[in-house]
A protein has these predicted regions:
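Helix-to-loop junction immediately C-terminal to a conserved catalytic motif
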Residues: 1
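Conserved ABC transporter NBD signature motif
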Residues: 9-17
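Conserved ABC ATPase signature
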Residues: 95-99, 103
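Hydrophobic anchor residue at the start of the ABC signature
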Residues: 109
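Conserved catalytic motifs of ABC-family nucleotide-binding domains
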Residues: 116
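Catalytic Walker B motif of ABC-type/P-loop ATPase nucleotide-binding domains
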Residues: 120-123
Length: 183
């Protein structure tokens, strides 16, 4: 994700060697080009659904501008993403801590996708869901990533999900030399 500098080798994302950037420049690059869905969602409980979704646009002018270009305003972008993910307008003003787990997960996905980042990193986002909810969420996530033109890096212990993805790696394969993959 670019938080820490690599101790050896190189990490290139969108043609940029992250090791060549200062800590501040890596932070800016990360917020401009990467959306995150955390396992625990990391929503700010005291903010509304809308405020949580719009948060990346407060830190990234690029993502704010992309949201405005695609939807006319940041508010409209948040509402459209939430609607596509199955959350309706009446929830926009509710506090994040008043939502069900499934609703919080969709808010986290909308926050990751707003402003069309090129890469979405999802860390165990389906671990708290039953089979039916998991399948529905994944289909929504795939559709939104496709619509935004975003690549999805999905981390899961659930091997049954592997066939849904173009490429999968096990942890044991990560430490082997691999051909570079441009994201």
């Amino acid at each position: 994700g670019g938080v820490q500098r690599a101790q050896s080798g190189h990490i290139r994302l969108l043609g940029q060697d992250l090791g060549q950037l200062s800590a501040g420049a890596r932070d800016r690059f990360r917020v401009d080009h990467t959306g995150y869905i955390f396992q625990q969602f990391n929503l700010l409980p005291f903010l509304s659904v809308r405020e949580n979704v719009e948060l990346p646009c407060r830190f990234s002018r690029l993502r704010a501008e992309r949201a405005r270009q695609r939807h006319g305003s940041i508010d409209a972008a948040a509402a459209a993403l939430l609607d596509h993910l199955g959350l309706h307008a009446e929830l926009l003003g509710r506090r994040a801590d008043e939502l069900s787990i499934g609703q919080q997960q969709r808010v986290a996905a909308a926050r990751a996708l707003i402003g069309q980042p090129e890469l979405v990193i999802a860390d165990e986002p389906t671990s708290a869901l039953d089979f039916d909810a998991r399948e529905a969420f994944l289909q929504l996530l795939f559709a939104e990533c496709r619509a935004a033109g975003a690549s999805l890096l999905f981390v899961s212990h659930d091997q049954s999900l592997a066939p849904l993805f173009d490429r999968s790696l096990s942890l044991s394969e990560l430490n082997r030399a691999a051909k570079p993959v441009e994201v």
